A protein has these predicted regions:
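Class I SAM-dependent methyltransferase Rossmann-like catalytic core
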Residues: 2-50
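Class I SAM-dependent methyltransferase SAM/SAH-binding core
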Residues: 50-118, 124, 138-141
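A short glycine-rich, Lys/Arg-flanked "PGG" loop and its adjoining helix->strand segment in the class I
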Residues: 137-152
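Conserved catalytic/acceptor-binding region of the Class I
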Residues: 154-216, 223-237
């Protein structure tokens, strides 16, 4: 009998969209980290022989990877996709953050667990810093659905040690969940294999960011749209004297 597939917490999708939309105007603040991880992903792509015709850039945010993918594969259709319309709208802002190399990219607003994309229509699903900390099995199943036979899934995500210092600090206050839990790489590999992905390769790198104070860290977390999205999290009201 196969071992049970690890489950991840249910998520408040409405809250997720609100948080990401709210972060759109400030998302450029954390581009340094997004571009660092994307650069490492593109280095790995150098070792893969692939000429995709259709590329889905999932959770594309401001579209930095979409731009680079369009340049790398000039004959491919690149589809930027994000659940936050506010971020997608930034692609067409008067002050463009990225060049689209003269190509018209079809932006799609949608959630990863229910993509508005036809089955077996995508050659490459790309996602940089994708939050797999919620509903991971159904999301991976959906990605398998949209991929063509022989298609490639390439993504980066955060690991369980993310914000471990902040989690330890909160544990001194109470026993509630303040930090969104992340998926272990071995569990992720099991989920991919369970959904029929062939020879999944999962590796890990430790990236350390140092902040001068908690206030600066909180600023970047808000800019990234990072929040505890568990549907079972405690609801709190902000008080003026808190």
């Amino acid at each position: 009998m196969s071992p049970p597939i690890p489950q991840t917490p249910p998520v408040n999708f409405a809250l997720r969209r609100r948080v990401r939309n709210r972060s759109a105007a400030k998302h450029e603040q954390i581009n340094f980290f997004c571009e660092e991880i994307a650069g490492r992903m593109f280095e790995r792509l150098d070792y893969i022989k692939l000429e995709p015709r259709v590329i889905l850039d999932l959770n594309c945010a401001l579209g930095a990877s979409s731009s680079k993918l369009a340049k790398r594969f000039p004959d491919a259709l690149v589809i930027p996709c994000d659940p936050a319309f506010g971020l997608l709208r930034m692609h067409a802002a008067p002050k463009k953050l990225f060049s689209w190399f003269g190509k018209s990219l079809n932006r799609v607003c949608g959630e990863a667990h229910a993509l508005p994309i036809a089955a077996k229509s995508v050659d490459l699903v790309w996602s940089n810093l994708f939050a797999l900390s919620y509903d991971a099995p159904s999301i991976i199943r959906e990605l398998k659905r949209v991929l063509k036979p022989g298609g490639l899934l390439m993504l980066s995500t955060l690991g369980p040690d993310t914000l471990k210092e902040l989690r330890a600090a909160f544990s001194q206050v109470d026993s509630l969940s303040h930090i969104q839990p992340q998926v272990d790489m071995h569990d992720l590999g099991d989920m991919l294999a369970h959904e029929g992905f062939q020879t999944p390769v999962v590796d890990m790198e430790m990236v350390t960011l140092t902040y001068p104070d908690v206030k600066t860290l909180a600023r970047d977390l808000r800019a990234a749209g990072a929040s505890n999205l568990e549907a079972t999290r405690r609801a709190t009201k902000k008080k003026k004297n808190r």
